[in-house]
Curated annotation (Swiss-Prot):
It is found in: Cytoplasm, Cytoskeleton; Cytoplasm, Cytosol; Cytoplasm, Perinuclear region; Nucleus. This is Formin-2. It comes from Mus musculus (Mouse). Belongs to the formin homology family. Cappuccino subfamily. The modification Phosphoserine is found at S89, S459, S489, S493. The gene is Fmn2. One of its GO terms (biological process) is vesicle-mediated transport. PANTHER family: FORMIN HOMOLOGY 2 DOMAIN CONTAINING, ISOFORM I, FORMIN-G.
Amino acid sequence: MGNQDGKLKRSAGDASHEGGGAEDAAGPRDAEITKKASGSKKALGKHGKGGGGSGETSKKKSKSDSRASVFSNLRIRKNLTKGKGACDSREDVLDSQALPIGELDSAHSIVTKTPDLSLSAEETGLSDTECADPFEVIHPGASRPAEAGVGIQATAEDLETAAGAQDGQRTSSGSDTDIYSFHSATEQEDLLSDIQQAIRLQQQQQQKLLLQDSEEPAAPPTAISPQPGAFLGLDQFLLGPRSEAEKDTVQALPVRPDLPETTKSLVPEHPPSSGSHLTSETPGYATAPSAVTDSLSSPAFTFPEAGPGEGAAGVPVAGTGDTDEECEEDAFEDAPRGSPGEEWVPEVEEASQRLEKEPEEGMRESITSAVVSLPGSPAPSPRCFKPYPLITPCYIKTTTRQLSSPNHSPSQSPNQSPRIKKRPDPSVSRSSRTALASAAAPAKKHRLEGGLTGGLSRSADWTEELGVRTPGAGGSVHLLGRGATADDSGGGSPVLAAKAPGAPATADGFQNVFTGRTLLEKLFSQQENGPPEEAEKFCSRIIAMGLLLPFSDCFREPCNQNAGSSSAPFDQDQLYTWAAVSQPTHSMDYSEGQFPRREPSMWPSSKLPEEEPSPKDVDTEPKSSILESPKKCSNGVQQEVFDVKSEGQATVIQQLEQTIEDLRTKIAELEKQYPALDLEGPRGLSGLENGLTASADVSLDALVLHGKVAQPPRTLEAKSIQTSPTEEGRILTLPPPKAPPEGLLGSPAAASGESALLTSPSGPQTKFCSEISLIVSPRRISVQLDAQQIQSASQLPPPPPLLGSDSQGQPSQPSLHTESETSHEHSVSSSFGNNCNVPPAPPLPCTESSSFMPGLGMAIPPPPCLSDITVPALPSPTAPALQFSNLQGPEMLPAPPQPPPLPGLGVPPPPPAPPLPGMGIPPPPPLPGMGIPPPPPLPGMGISPLPPLPGMGIPPPPPLPGVGIPPPPPLPGVGIPPPPPLPGVGIPPPPPLPGVGIPPPPPLPGVGIPPPPPLPGVGIPPPPPLPGVGIPPPPPLPGVGIPPPPPLPGSGIPPPPALPGVAIPPPPPLPGMGVPPPAPPPPGAGIPPPPLLPGSGPPHSSQVGSSTLPAAPQGCGFLFPPLPTGLFGLGMNQDRVARKQLIEPCRPMKPLYWTRIQLHSKRDSSPSLIWEKIEEPSIDCHEFEELFSKTAVKERKKPISDTISKTKAKQVVKLLSNKRSQAVGILMSSLHLDMKDIQHAVVNLDNSVVDLETLQALYENRAQSDELEKIEKHSRSSKDKENAKSLDKPEQFLYELSLIPNFSERVFCILFQSTFSESICSIRRKLELLQKLCETLKNGPGVMQVLGLVLAFGNYMNAGNKTRGQADGFGLDILPKLKDVKSSDNSRSLLSYIVSYYLRNFDEDAGKEQCVFPLAEPQELFQASQMKFEDFQKDLRKLKKDLKACEAEAGKVYQVSSAEHMQPFKENMEQFISQAKIDQESQEAALTETHKCFLETTAYYFMKPKLGEKEVSPNVFFSVWHEFSSDFKDAWKKENKLILQERVKEAEEVCRQKKGKSLYKVKPRHDSGIKAKISMKT
């Protein structure tokens, strides 16, 4: 599709309506379009055909969007104005280009684009997602008129932000490269400028947010509450348009009631970002997500002030379908470019958080989802939105480019609306996913590889889906609830499933292609204070990490781009695109038959944690896997499908505005209280190495400062979608504690900075194309768990893996992420292997959400100490808690105070005790200052995990059972210890290098090579399992809306019975908890995945089918570097953990040589296999073992040599010579007989067991008299000695043979009996043949006639010759020469003539079957010629002699043998000897007679012996006849055949003649007229 799309787009021209042209025409639009790249690409594919402004059906566009997933991540300003919208014409593109170059994602660009946005998506003809402007800036306070561009209404703050973005932004790179062009470098510069601009805009917006909080009234709560960042599509902007999975996530949150298809009852839990309306309004928002991705760096920068006010303002609630769509479109367009989008996202997130608290949260979710979907949708050009009905076309990647193109860049996979489910459930129609996929093209691409539409894709109308999925509540619980509803439908919202076929795919899927200058501009816009050098440095780091790839390289290594390929120096003029770190399609969530899909990163919520219920972002989680949360119940609005048009968009807008205003006010207050946050946000941005900020500037100090401040206004969340087959863990974001001790957690900015540093990999990590999503979440969630809850939580089985863990998360175990929750909920959430008996380690690098992709500048604040949660240090004699020493460098977080023990766990961590049984080495005592000791190693662990080194906020979880060696403690300065290796992992990965906030999660089971350590800046380790839990789930971190549902109080195991094969049933939901825990995995799944912690995103499906691999716990908003390319199937040193337990039969069984199929080893996302459904029935092992055990096979007897005990060489006595001993040894090894068998055969003359050949070999190798003498002598001498040396095997064998009574005599008689009969018979046959030949040659009539003809013709030829003529006979020697006498014409020989003459004149049967050959047969003559009478005589004499010997031997046996051994030997041998004598005498007489006859025959032919011979030998005589007979027979056959043919012809001729005479042919008279002729013809 890639080539086709490109062609279409080119045909459409610069004015391409879908937004590709928009980028080409308008610089700002270019950025927007680039952000909308997924949509743009899609538009290019199909929409490009339509030409700018053409009203292509939204369905068609959605198809193009989904198809464009190949290039969905590319931002191409040069391309069609797809981002602008199908309605946009070339002029529109030009107009957009006329906008300030810097206006990549700025509010100004959005404002300028507003006129376009004023057109509703439907009017423009674009799908909602397509029309939505990704960077549409919507004032929270200002309601967007249906036709008026809401972006214009953006508050001054938004405008300022936009301006900042514009400054950072650039118009098209200036190169006219097509989206599909492999070589376009200008976009890289654009991306960099966009990032810089986003940074500056972020700072400005953050500052303005405080001011604007009071300025803009909060929009009245409506069914759709804006999601933080949704308005701006910041998540998408930061993350880049999400893959369709992101869109799916966004779509899960319906934005507007008017969303026709998607909007069912889904109410976005978070306030919609600019791209939050994924459904009908999604267009704008879809672009926003892409914008978010583009401005990854900006998200890396903290947006402390971009909070509610701007977020809400930036992204007006899609109250009115048209206005919302336009705003969304602008937001998307702007968001992808402008940091404003990012700023808006935090704002929107905050607003959404507020809204989520309100019933408006549902609306926010819808809006957010719309925003998310927008990035993927071909967002219309800056302001022009063509309202196209949402269409979710399903496209199958058919083109080589699509298949090979890299997965959508992270920009394409920005978190869609936190409400949006990133990947629809398999149950969700793939078409809906496709629509989503188009919105989140990057993710979609991988998904598409896995399936037609890709699980991540969502229809533009994600709002409906979101509404259906979940109530508007913005909490993680809400997301869980929504996920339960929507995700239950199949990963995507039910609406998605329903609308999937027709719903337009969000334009989110396009790749962002941008110049380096654009990226720099965005960075500047986000961080005004950051010098350009830092931005360039940051971009270079991103490239080095492989997150940012030259656009030309993105297609060379489609899905497995090696980070090395991206290591080229950063060039402003170079076109860049985000490396799609997507997981293989199978790694995506797999729930209910759906294969796991890469999920886009989630949106952070702009609201403060307190304000916003921490909505959970649904990361392309199967709906079934999504846990319903209380939010779902509270957000009834989400359940309703709102038609924005029918419901009235004004209400939604008002609600959003009110929410935005509230968020602004709250943010302003927080910022005033904690001004340090604002400062550190930019600092973190600039400091990110691979994130949006330079890592140098980012430090844990920022985190610490923010922690001291108490609560970071927002948290940054980074997500990357990776192709890693292992799993895609979701980002685990730990909300800062209400009172973080020692400022453990910094402000979001600081956190983001730190996380960026931590996350920045030491080297390029991206092996696979991945999407990176940055989310800014101003809010933090600080929820204290009740003692009972905590205690019960400790009893909980491991929570199920987040759906987000594509490859590893349990497909059936949903986990919700709320965009607004972002890092908070993500930190709380940790996905454990679905079927793992032990909690999974954190997601591997490359895991979509958990892995922090290099270049992902997203700084995520480290999780606060579990201060709010009374989590006691895990009492473990083997795992004393290490206390953190001062962290090295500003980046190190101070150690959180050790939380008091959980209720019921009153014992504080005891001093190190002796290692438990089976544990090789107890962990060292905790270092002073460590807040929480590492949990003791699980039973069966050889070595307890080393306690975390000083400076680690949370000790690493103990190695899982079966892990031979616990991971080494993190080096000093490492913020968080690496999680223990998962079961089956032989060696844990080395600890992260100093300065790395979070060590890479241990390799999943079966992964031979541990993933590279996470990039610096990742500051939160997975929480340690609570004590007392068989498989302890990670304790809920502070700020988590709802702790993981512990089993009912006092119940060691949760009530629900485990399904067959499920070791531990899922824990029951806590009382009052809105979302029940996911259903236990299907039988055979092993242990159900641990329930998602509140705020955690949906668990990634652990793998295709139910896999035993645990899902890695979410890191706090950081992306791990992608796994090396070769880790999937190849290069794995260790066997993957099998799904089924090892069977140990009681007996060794016969092997069945079949080809094994293991579901977890599958990499592709082919349709579910029958093996996933088939269950093994119980079988009767006992009967089966009896029948098919190896013992049933008859054992082959060992060689007789093995029966003799072998003694040491020095003790063996060798009496035989070496040669003799070797010969006997060979015989022994060849005999598989027992000595008893041999004795039986010899004594009883039974040849059935021991054949004659074996007896002959034994007889020939029997011990000779002298040898036997020696052996007997040694035996006698050794009897008297105790320690006498034993005989060697050959000697022992010969000695045992000699013990058989009369062995030699008996065997000789037996052998002679057999040979005598054969010899006599042979002699008899030969003598009879000679006699027969002699008689034939003497008296045969044929011979006489032939010889007479020869004589006649010879005399005739020799007539007149006195020497030869008139002969009476001739010597036989002439007979062989007759064939050489030729006729005068050489046509025939004399022999052939004689044969012909004989047959025609003498043989009456010539030519008939009865014809008999007149001469002796050549074969008999030949045999006779080989005989000699001397040989006959010799053989007879030998037989006579042997017969006498046999008689003598038999006599000996008669004399010596005992009576028991006498018979049947005596009787048999006597009879044989008597008959043998008779036969031998008769043959002697026959030989004499035959000899006499032969001599007579030779004399008869007058044959004379040669000189020196007494008589003619049979050889001479019969050789002549043999030769003549052979030649004669050949001629005879030919002539006989010829005669036969002649006779046949004669017979036929006779028949003809007879017929001719008998029949009279009368020629009929025919009429000569015309009628007669005609009749004859007819």
